[in-house]
Amino acid sequence: MLVHTYSAMERPDGLGAAAGGARLSSLPQAAYGPAPPLCHTPAATAAAEFQPPYFPPPYPQPPLPYGQAPDAAAAFPHLAGDPYGGLAPLAQPQPPQAAWAAPRAAARAHEEPPGLLAPPARALGLDPRRDYATAVPRLLHGLADGAHGLADAPLGLPGLAAAPGLEDLQAMDEPGMSLLDQSVIKKVPIPSKASSLSALSLAKDSLVGGITNPGEVFCSVPGRLSLLSSTSKYKVTVGEVQRRLSPPECLNASLLGGVLRRAKSKNGGRCLRERLEKIGLNLPAGRRKAANVTLLTSLVEGEAVHLARDFGYVCETEFPAKAAAEYLCRQHADPGELHSRKSMLLAAKQICKEFADLMAQDRSPLGNSRPALILEPGVQSCLTHFSLITHGFGGPAICAALTAFQNYLLESLKGLDKMFLSSVGSGHGETKASEKDAKHRK
């Protein structure tokens, strides 16, 4: 055993150990505890592994004025007590199991996936080494997918029992809905017949697939085409938002925010998705639009219908159908072509009338209305697609254009009738003049 002693060491200033001891004899002995023996025995080595290191006092040590104070305890009151009394609990050796328990628990918590029982187990003081996750399903994809497993699994823990009535929840599946991959309606569980709200009452309230009332106002947006002096706001309903997120447009969060006139912000898309989830609509992040963006994409349905109505009024009252018909009739004033041209105009009028009658039978949904169908489903579905792309502007606009074209055809037929009468009258006058000349010659 190798033991180091310091009894014979001398100071560099020439004073011996005896002189130094005489100088420091007045200091209290409790200020400096006995130094541990420096040895290399196995027992001492095992105990030294858990001994705290030496920490100097947190204050600067002033030089001791040797020989100037008769009483060192009175001159230095801060040395009266034990300066290392606060480190006494650290000097107690800890067993290896307690020292490594916290790192092992932290590593286990880092390796295990976040489950249902991790926070409750820690809150109840349960042993972290026990694995409760094998008997309990983890809810990773929402309540609708794991509600039955949560109600059936024997948790056996207080405070973690299934919610009352949770086992009665069942997912509603509409047989007529074919919105599997592109669905924007959030599937939520609805109570069964035994619950207070039945499926019949939900159907009456138009809560189809978890969506709230389609006629409920989602927000109000200012018009894009109105003047500043007559700015009007249009109400956007929940049903319109659902139509904009559904085919054929399938708008993403960025385009929908532009349609709703929402200012761009850092978390604008996330806030919009959270608000849509509250009304039962699902807008996944990173979604791509399905249709090309046009100027009509920025219009809400109310403004698009307003634009179509104004366009129809202008076409009916301001389109120069008579001037255009007279101009074209003068270019085809040959008497030999009058009959053939009139036949072509009558045929065009008939074709235009047939097409106008077809457009008049269009029953595309306008807003939240669902009129009864008149046309065949194949033709009506195509017209509905066109109406959804134009937000209700396309059909009325085409009808207004057809009305203007029909007015042109009517004015053209009137012009041809006048030209035919004038040509017949002029021909009859020429025959009378020739007869008079023949009589004078006789």
UniProtKB/Swiss-Prot annotation:
Protein name: Transcription factor AP-2-epsilon
Gene from which this protein is expressed: TFAP2E
Free-text tissue specificity from the UniProt record: Expressed in skin, primary keratinocytes, immortalized keratinocytes, and HeLa cell line.
Organism from which the protein derives: Homo sapiens
PANTHER family: TRANSCRIPTION FACTOR AP-2 (PTHR10812), TRANSCRIPTION FACTOR AP-2-EPSILON (PTHR10812:SF13)
Function: Sequence-specific DNA-binding protein that interacts with inducible viral and cellular enhancer elements to regulate transcription of selected genes. AP-2 factors bind to the consensus sequence 5'-GCCNNNGGC-3' and activate genes involved in a large spectrum of important biological functions including proper eye, face, body wall, limb and neural tube development. They also suppress a number of genes including MCAM/MUC18, C/EBP alpha and MYC. AP-2-epsilon may play a role in the development of the CNS and in cartilage differentiation.
Residues bearing PTM Phosphoserine: 246
GO BP terms: positive regulation of transcription by RNA polymerase II; regulation of cell population proliferation
Subunit structure: Binds DNA as a dimer. Can form homodimers or heterodimers with other AP-2 family members.
Main location, first listed in the record: nucleus
Pfam families (UniProt xref): TF_AP-2
Keywords: Activator, DNA-binding, Nucleus, Phosphoprotein, Transcription, Transcription regulation
Motif residue range(s): PPxY motif: 54-59
GO cellular component terms given for this protein: chromatin; nucleus
GO molecular function, one term: identical protein binding
Subcellular location: Nucleus
Family statement: Belongs to the AP-2 family.
Top-level division of the source organism's lineage: Eukaryota
Chain residue ranges for the region called H-S-H (helix-span-helix), dimerization: 287-417
N-terminal signal peptide: none
